[in-house]
Amino acid sequence: MRIVAQRVTRASVTIDGKVKSEIGLGMLILLGIEEADTQEDVEWLCQKLTKLRIFDDGNDSMNLDINQVGGSFLVVSQFTLHALTKKGNRPSFIRAARPEQAIPLYEMFLKRLAEISGREVQSGEFGAMMAVELINDGPVTIIMDSKRRE
């Protein structure tokens, strides 16, 4: 699993002109699921995201986690995070998990993130064309990969 976590002051997902989900202060998570991903990847990322200290402590230091600032999560599935661009100019998404594998892991990720963090978890709609809006705070953007444990 690969994620892009962005610290936001607000974020929203709009589908077919209607706002589906929105949050205030928190993290927008773009989540890419690959064929080799398992429940272990879900657990590792959810634990890491919950404890990730990327929020300002008032002294210009990132010392606070999402619980300490009362933030929320907005999770959006994004298979393009597993694009391969080595050959040619058209990205290949061969490593991205097929929907029959990805959807259960996506739903598990949403559930476990809420359980582990105790925070509100909003989401986009798996497979839908979405307009994602955000105000990136900082900007702070973190890329994590569960296979590399970084």
Residue ranges and their predicted role:
Residues 11:
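RNA/tRNA-interacting regions in translation and RNA-turnover enzymes
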Residues 18-70, 80-111, 116:
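Compact, glycine-rich, soluble single-domain proteins
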Residues 6, 32, 77, 133, ...:
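Short beta-strand segments
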Residues 45, 76, 140:
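Residue-level signal for inorganic ion chemistry
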Residues 93-150:
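Positively charged, low-complexity, intrinsically disordered RNA-binding extensions
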Residues 58-73, 122-134:
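Glycine/charge-rich, flexible interdomain linkers and switch-proximal surface loops
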